[in-house]
Amino acid sequence: MTIILTNDDGIDAPGIKALAQAVSGKNFIVAAPRDHQSGCGHQVTTTRPINLQRRSDSEYAIAGTPADCIRIAITQISQDVKFVLSGINAGGNLGVDAYISGTVAAVREAAMHGIAGVAISHYRKAKQNFDWELAAKWTAEVLEELLHRPLEPGYFWNVNLPHLQPGETQPELVFCQPCTKPLPANYRIDGDDFYYVGEYGKRERTPGSDVDVCFTGNIAITQLRV
């Protein structure tokens, strides 16, 4: 069974290295964007060539979006892909974030082709540093649970890790529903220019939703569909 690893932060980002650490010992191929693609959503490339750089037998840097990476991985790199993992994103992809997230788009694209997948993101609190070793540990625990759970066709998992401080209680895995409340749409205006200043951590949230679960220190797991 071949697992494809991808992300939207780029192939050299620390998050995808932590993801590789989480699946150490499994048969995986990294097929990830050559450059940063955060916030690209489900964009695909159809009007220009997509350059592929083979770094090794199991690592490919692709000059495209996360969805492009999955399309190329499952049609050109391996015919035996059984699972797609996307992440670990440096920042949350909670609730309605899924619609603009390249991280989530990668596993949505996989689901469209009948391949199961998990998107993993790490909420960041107040621009504090990430502990990628800890993120890899949590991700391994999550995948131990999810890789063996059946998924109906067209469904996929979206996981968000909390941002905890040393000594805080170990997070629980909580299966929940995605929050449908919007992201803050606040802007600073300078002449004809609008600068986004919405504060992610101050977004509204429905009690018990993925935003609420993650913001209160637990691992939020939602099942989404195409």
Swiss-Prot record:
Coiled coil: none annotated. PANTHER family: 5'-NUCLEOTIDASE SURE, PHOSPHATASE, PUTATIVE (AFU_ORTHOLOGUE AFUA_4G01070)-RELATED. It comes from Nostoc sp. (strain PCC 7120 / SAG 25.82 / UTEX 2576). Its cofactor is a divalent metal cation. This is Putative 5'-nucleotidase alr3139. Belongs to the SurE nucleotidase family. Nucleotidase that shows phosphatase activity on nucleoside 5'-monophosphates. NCBIfam families: PRK00346.2-3, surE. One of its GO terms (molecular function) is nucleotide binding. Binds 1 divalent metal cation per subunit. Its main location: cytoplasm. Keywords: Cytoplasm, Hydrolase, Metal-binding, Nucleotide-binding. SUPFAM superfamilies: SurE-like (SSF64167). GO terms for cellular component: cytoplasm. A divalent metal cation binds at residues 8-9, 38, 89. Its EC number is 3.1.3.5. The keyword RNA-binding does not apply. Pfam families: SurE. It catalyses: a ribonucleoside 5'-phosphate + H2O = a ribonucleoside + phosphate. It is found in: Cytoplasm.
